[in-house]
A protein has these predicted regions:
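Switch/coupling loops of ABC transporter nucleotide-binding domains
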Residues: 2, 33, 82
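Conserved acidic segment of CheY-like receiver
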Residues: 2-22, 57
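Conserved SAM-binding loop
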Residues: 6, 37, 86-87
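Cofactor-binding loop segments of dinucleotide-utilizing enzymes, especially the Rossmann-like FAD-
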Residues: 9, 40, 89
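Short, well-ordered amphipathic alpha-helices
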Residues: 15-25, 44-45, 72
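Short helix-capping segments at alpha-helix termini
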Residues: 25-30, 78-80
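Short hydrophobic/Thr-rich beta-strand motif most characteristic of the beta2 strand and flanking loop
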Residues: 27-40, 47
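CheY-like receiver
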Residues: 45-46, 51-116
């Protein structure tokens, strides 16, 4: 089972990403992929206290309350094996993101092709 968590404060982006990942998961059911989306870093961290950290976390960088880079640090404290992928419209945080050994840094606007 591959657990993917998405955190983006933009409901439209969160919905598009979640729908695309779920469509991929349905088409590749042999991989056992589950996707869960969260509207804020705090909602994601609260859930992880109950369920544990995901295998992959797709994080918006610029969110109110807590930056995605800060959220990544918290996730990596919980599980150093979680792959982090940042999604952002800004390249200002690229150095910080890669210092966290991010698996990828995808620039918004999000398109399905950017995940391939």
């Amino acid at each position: 089972m591959l657990r993917i968590a998405i955190c983006d404060d933009d409901a439209g982006e969160r919905t598009r990403i979640t729908e695309d990942l779920r469509a991929y998961a349905d088409a590749h059911s042999e991989h056992g992929i589950t996707c869960t989306a969260y509207p804020s870093a705090f909602a994601m961290l609260d859930a992880f206290e109950k369920t544990g950290c995901p295998d992959v976390a797709l994080l918006d960088v610029c969110m109110p309350g807590m930056l995605g880079t800060e959220l990544a640090r918290e996730i990596l404290r919980c599980s150093a094996s979680t792959d982090i992928i940042f999604l952002t419209a800004s390249s200002d945080y690229a150095v910080d993101a890669f210092s966290l050994h991010a698996a990828d840094y995808i620039q918004k606007p999000y398109t399905r092709e950017k995940f391939s």
